[in-house]
Amino acid sequence: DKVIKLPKPNLNRTGTVMKALSERHSTREFASKALNLSDLSDLLWAANGINRSDSGKRTAPSALNKQDVDVYVVLPEGSYLYDAKNHQLNLIAEGDYRGAVAGGQAFVISAPVSLVLVSDLSRFGDTKNAHTQLMGAMDAGIVSQNISIFCSAARLATVPRASMAVSYTHLR
C-alpha cells in the first residue's frame, strides 16, 4: 500500500514511566512475526507523534520547535515515512531494505521493523553549523529515548543503533 492509515493511538495503555524506565534494556534478539498495526501505531505516536493537535506539537520536544526529526519505518514490504500530522505511513520505496539499514549488524535484518531517525538540518537553516548539528543529534536522541521507553512499557524488543549502509541514503 502507498499509504497505511494507522489506528488512533491507545492513550490508555497500562504501565508507568517508572516501571518502563526500570525495565528498559537493549536486546539483539527479535521475534520474526510482524508487529501488529496497533502496536506500530502506538510506537510511532510515542516516538514523535502529535500530542497537542491545537498547536501541532509533539511527544518529543525539538530545538527551536523545528520538528526536525523524521521517522522512517522499514518493513519487509517497503520503507515508509511516518506522517505525524495524519498519523499514517507514506510509502517511500517498495521492497525489503532491512538489510540496508542493518549497517553490517546481522541481528537487525530479521527484526520485523526498523525505525530510522533522520534530523533534517535544513529546517534549522545552516546545515554546516556545528551547533545546528548538535541540536539535530539531540533531537534524534530524544525521539530514540521515547522509542526505548515505549518498547519497555509494551514489552517490545528494541536496541538503539547509529549505523546503516551509507549507499542507501538515497531512500530519503
Task: Identify the meaning behind each predicted range.
Residues P112-L115, L121-S122:
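Histidine/lysine/aspartate-rich catalytic loop segments that bind and position anionic ligands
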Residues T169-H170:
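Conserved small/polar residues in nucleotide/adenosyl-binding loops
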Residues D1-A111:
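N-terminal amphipathic, basic helical "cap/leader" segment at the start of enzyme domains
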Residues G49-N51, L121-F124:
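Solvent-exposed loop/turn segments at secondary-structure junctions
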Residues A130-D139:
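Short pre-catalytic strand/loop immediately N-terminal to key active-site residues, enriched for Gly-Thr
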Residues S152-M164:
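Glycine-rich phosphate/pyrophosphate-binding loops
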